[in-house]
Design a protein with these regions (language model features):
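Beta-strand residues in well-ordered beta-sheet regions across diverse protein folds
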Residues: 40, 113-115
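C-terminal terminal-subdomain/extension
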Residues: 102-104, 111
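Edge beta-strand at a domain terminus
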Residues: 109, 117-131
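Central antiparallel beta-sheet cores of small beta-barrel/beta-sandwich binding domains
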Residues: 10-11, 16-101, 128
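Sec/Tat signal peptide C-region and signal peptidase I cleavage site
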Residues: 2-6
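Structural motif
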Residues: 33, 106-108
Length: 131
């Protein structure tokens, strides 16, 4: 993988940010295998966060599983001809809900716009590249 492609790709290590406090919430590692992008929580960064926190709001097999190591992003693929990845899902472990997701690298790949939506409602977070 070329350095330029790596920078304009969601693949890498990212810090998700608390939108209200502008402080890091979690570190997420995004990988790609067979054209499909997946993101897992590596660490919880919020001040006072329990590193052994469980996803108490999650449903099904994720209920009460550790948040660290959990897959948040799944099934995402690159849109042909665009620097956009979509078609997958993102989990919010704080409320246990899953959303459709679109990932768009911006600022020369140093930031990642993570847009989650349910129907006509959406929210965009900006994550910061760590690596």
């Amino acid at each position: 993988m070329s350095a330029a492609w790596a920078q304009m790709s969601p693949v890498g290590t990212w810090r998700s940010m608390d939108e209200k406090e502008n402080t890091p919430k979690a570190q997420v590692k995004i990988t790609e295998a067979g054209g499909v992008v997946t993101g897992k929580v590596e660490a919880l960064l919020r001040k006072g966060a329990d590193p052994n926190a469980l996803c108490t709001e999650c449903k099904d097999e994720l209920k009460d599983k550790p948040v660290v190591g959990m897959t948040l992003i799944s099934g995402v693929k690159k849109v042909e001809g665009k620097e956009v990845w979509e078609g997958g899902r993102i989990l919010d472990p704080e409320n246990g809900k899953t959303y459709t997701v679109r990932l768009t690298p911006v600022d020369a790949g140093q930031k990642l716009e993570v847009r989650g939506s349910i129907g006509p409602f959406w929210r965009t977070q900006t994550w910061i590249r760590v690596q």
